[in-house]
From Swiss-Prot:
Region annotated Domain II, chain positions: 75-110
Principal subcellular localization: cytoplasm
Keywords: ATP-binding, Cytoplasm, DNA replication, DNA-binding, Lipid-binding, Nucleotide-binding
Family: Belongs to the DnaA family.
The protein's name in its UniProt record: Chromosomal replication initiator protein DnaA
Disulfide bonds: none
Organism: Elusimicrobium minutum (strain Pei191)
Length: 452
């Protein structure tokens, strides 16, 4: 193996990790790490002592696997912490302020990504309320009418960007504000780590002394009883101290399945949904990414991508990166025919997704299970009806661009019933290969019907 990780290999690994964890997570947790390889030992240098080794390890294990595949052979992981080699110099303090009460101010390690700002966020009809609410939080930090702020959406629509933008704007106005960004998964991991180290008080002191707590993907805390309880007490401590709390989720507070006391707290502030961006917003997002990245891509190609990819901003930007990388490697200028070829798998999948009609789903599933179509909307709850209904609702979440409430209305059920059906069928598919094959056959039949 090479003694160091060369730049090409590092870039390839980073791109691969972005497909696994997403661009935002890699920017926050992977890029700040320094990696070197010597004598089959991958040394991972954490940027400071506050960095969670538990969280970093999740990303590093994937990097390790990627390097082993790339170069062959097993490697070991060793962790280190970056030391500040700058010689210590006592700060010059006027004699009148020196003494026992003197405390030098040190910026709090916020974990924020400085690239995510309000200025870099494209506002549109789909996200306007969430964007304006985020700005209001900064102007009236900790005020009851804006606290907490909960932003929810499907993945890849900009929730994390807004979280970081809030923190970065606060720090711009007050560099010594105690801001902390973390995911729900990280909260759980650090809490467990504090229990294992028999030092939960340090964990509580850290999280309950903040000026602003920014938590991404709170749904990861749900279902973990002791972590939910710890977060509830942390929430109360911050809320009663008039400190700001901003949370994101992939579902509404009512759908989280958490302690009703906490759910009630989350609903007491502002709850805002980010929907899929419309065509104009998608074009604006791609133009901004093109201009900031200095990509040579014409507006006609930008419009083609924006029209063909509607699922998420993350996927939009990923398509732009894929196209420009392909064109750079082959020395060609991006055109619509080239974009159509390079992005055919994504755009064709998106087109198929948007073409599926919920009536086609009902028709095929009812025929497969030998029930009447009207049974999907009936009040009957016996297994012979409820099971096909759950399958049909699951397929509607997978094969259409309908929102959960829209699917609920299609089946005359509420969105929580749709969520339950989706999770139940997903679990069954994962655990039963025969059932998974059955679902795949139903999907093929639905697509065949929809083409007629």
């Amino acid at each position: 193996m090479n003694n160091i990780i060369n730049e090409d290999l590092k870039n390839r690994i980073l791109k691969e990790m972005e497909t696994v964890f997403g661009v935002e997570a890699c920017e926050t947790w992977l890029k700040p790490l320094s990696l070197s390889l010597k004598n089959d030992i991958l040394t991972v240098t954490l940027p400071n002592k506050f960095w969670s080794k538990t969280i970093a390890d999740k990303y590093v294990q994937e990097v390790k696997s990627s390097i082993e595949k790339e170069q062959g052979g097993d490697i070991q992981i060793k962790y280190d912490v970056l030391e500040d080699t700058t010689p210590y110099k006592r700060p010059e303090i006027p004699p009148q302020v020196m003494g026992a009460n003197y405390n030098a101010k040190i910026p709090f390690p916020s974990r924020l990504n400085p690239n995510y700002t309000f200025e870099g966020f494209i506002e549109g009809p789909s996200n306007r309320f969430a964007y304006r609410a985020a700005e209001a939080v900064v102007k009236k930090l900790g005020e009851r009418e804006n606290n907490p702020l909960v932003i929810y959406s499907t993945p890849g629509l900009g929730k994390t960007h807004l979280l970081h933008a809030i923190g970065n704007r606060i720090l711009k106005e007050n560099p010594y504000a105690k801001i902390l960004y973390m995911s729900g998964e990280e909260f759980v991991s650090e809490y467990i780590e504090s229990l294992q180290n028999r030092n939960p008080e340090a964990f509580r002191k850290k999280h309950r002394s903040l000026d602003c707590f920014l938590m991404d993907d709170i749904q990861f805390v749900a279902g973990k009883e002791s972590s939910v309880q710890e977060f509830f007490y942390t929430f109360n401590a911050l809320f009663e101290s008039k400190k700001q709390i901003v949370l994101t989720s992939d579902r509404t507070p009512q759908q989280l399945g958490i302690d009703p006391r906490l759910s009630s707290r989350l609903l007491s502030g502002i709850v805002s949904e980010i929907k899929r961006p419309d065509l104009e917003t998608r074009i604006a997002i791609l133009r901004q990414k093109r201009d900031t990245s200095n990509f040579d891509v014409g507006d006609d190609v930008i419009a083609f991508i924006a029209e063909g990819v509607q699922a998420s901003i993350r996927e939009l930007e990923g398509c732009l990166f894929r196209l420009t990388t392909y064109c750079n490697i082959h020395g060609v200028t991006p055109t619509i025919p080239i974009a159509r070829e390079v992005l055919s798998d994504i755009i064709s999948m998106e087109e198929k997704r948007l073409l599926i009609n919920p009536n086609s789903i009902k028709k095929v599933v009812s025929k497969h299970f030998k029930i009447d179509i009207i049974d999907f909307n009936s009040k009957r709850k016996n297994h012979s009806i409820a099971w096909p209904r759950q399958i049909a609702m699951y397929l509607a979440t997978e094969l259409t661009d309908m929102s959960l409430p829209e699917i609920g209305r299609e089946f005359e059920r509420d969105h929580s019933t749709v969520v339950h059906a989706r999770e139940k069928i997903k679990e069954e598919i994962e655990n039963d290969p025969f059932f998974a094959a059955q679902i795949n056959q139903i999907i093929s039949d639905i697509k065949a019907v929809d083409k007629r």
